[in-house]
Amino acid sequence: MGDDGIEWELEDLDGGVLYDVFYESTTMLAGRMLAQRRLAAARGDRDGERRAEADRHGLLAARDKVGPTDRRTLIAAKRSNDAARGARAEAVAPWHAVGGSLKVDVEGIWRDDIRPVVDAAERSDKPCTVFVGGQPGAGKTRATHLVRVSGLHDGPLLPVNGDDLRQYHPDYDRLCDEEPLAMPERTAKASAAWIRMTMEYADENGIPAIVEGTWRNAATVLDEAANAKHAGRSTHAVVLAVPPVLSRLAMLERYY
């Protein structure tokens, strides 16, 4: 491990874990930009609000262009994301005192922040839903990217990822800094609701989608597949068969 720890570790990560680490760092930076936008809105700073949203939009657009096998770019982008997030820490600090005290307006956040993103996705006369399943550390995010560019569906697939949706929780950015181990549990209820709303909207509006999850609750996945079928969509399942010991090592590599 190098003097700074993280950089040396990045060089050693395998492909699937490296892509997931890069992707997570992008989500965390996007969450900070979202917190900055909300802080600017609360202050009536329209210019600051627009700047934060433009930065966030550019970040997420750039993320989708990075290939999962481009190690050089993945490592550089991960480091850049971490540096950019750190540089915004002081500016976003006032939001941390606000976000933790707010009641989570699940419907309002869906309406104002998430639905516009979903609504911008491309429609299809023959929509499909792809379900990607595997345990934590299996490389689901990398697999999702590979499926999206594989040609399985003739057109774009809207990615639906519970970890991505956590960033919309008003306390997400503070939790990532101060209580990272508690963050998944604290944001789980809202994230699950937003997944459900996103899938319902995709089904109703003919938006092809790819859904990533652990499939911990088989009934939930089967219900979503049945809903998709009832909506006239084709369905596909992508299952990652990864030995438990490898996924455990992947989680250790990712967080330590």
Where are the language model's segments positioned?
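Conserved lysine of the Walker
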Residues: 140
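The conserved Walker
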Residues: 135-136
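Phosphate-binding P-loop
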Residues: 120-127, 202-203
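Hydrophobic positions on the alpha1 helix immediately C-terminal to the Walker A/P-loop
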Residues: 143
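Conserved nucleotide-sensing/catalytic segment adjacent to the nucleotide-binding pocket
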Residues: 154-159, 164-225
